[in-house]
Amino acid sequence: MGMIQYLQVDQYGAFISKHSERLIVVKGKEKLIQAPLIHLESVLISNHGVSISSDAIQECTERGIPIYFISHNGAPYASLYSAGLTGTVITRRAQYEALQTIQGLRLVLSIGIGKMQNQSTLLKYMSKYRKGTDPTLFQELRLLSTEILDHVIEMEKITQRPEYQSGSLRIADVREEILGIEGRAAQKYWRGVKQILPERYGFPGRVRKGAKDPINSALNYGYGILYGQIERSLVLAGLDPFAGFLHVDRPGKPSLTLDFIEEFRPVAVDRVIFGMANKNMPFELDGEGLLTRETRLIIAEKITERLESTVPFEGKQYPLRNIMQMQARHVATFLRGEKETYTPLQIRW
């Protein structure tokens, strides 16, 4: 029996139960998977028609093993955690108060800057493979990478305003401006991505909901997997994933998760999907325009490998999954006022 740390179940009709010290996945009379609980770190249910017993849920929550639910197109719709993972009162009070103080704005700006820097870096990284084969495309990608950094400067200028320096500026005062800056950077990023990807995929540009093309479908599914890891990191750091800053609070909307995920999208998902595409991964779709089960499993495997890969961070090498947890704790300490700044993850390839 191999060691399973991240259990994914996506077969219609599958049933997850607990037996002794293991989770057992069966479909009818066929035993599909046995996962020893001692090694298990998370459970991902990624299709409809999958059932799980109350005993399995209880055992997972008692052991601190989160259970995530995403649809077959990658849209997350539920998570189960231990009732004890609700964070400290001090951390959550500081988080709620930060929405009305300069602290929340400082966090939003840092995350936004980190996201754009990573987008710029990824375009630059992808361009180097075109230097000899397509010099014109190489120059175009380099230009777009530089233009994204111009938007970083635009974001940084907000911190030079007198009202920011005095501490009186609030997120609500500049929310639309920040979203506009990020949107203009995203336009350049996806314009570059479209030129990087093989034409046979027919990438139309970024489509979030209702995507029917293979690249957007793969990205959305990958983001759904990443979403669960991000939410888990925030909960373990004592933060409320539903109380964000840039994304407006709405019932059932995990706005802090949506804020925090931004600096990791290019690093954890985009690079993986673009790399797979440039190696001619078929990203097969079914008759309804959705990713096939086999394609979803391959994407999940590649995203998991990426999360387990090490990258430089704070002078050492850490698995990307661990860095997410470290960064979530940095967010918590920053909001509590124990750190003067929050430094986003910035990848150098």
Regions found by a protein language model. Give the residues of each.
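Short, acidic/turn-prone active-site loops that include or flank metal/cofactor-
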Residues: 49, 72-75
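NTP/phosphate- and nucleic-acid-binding module
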Residues: 24
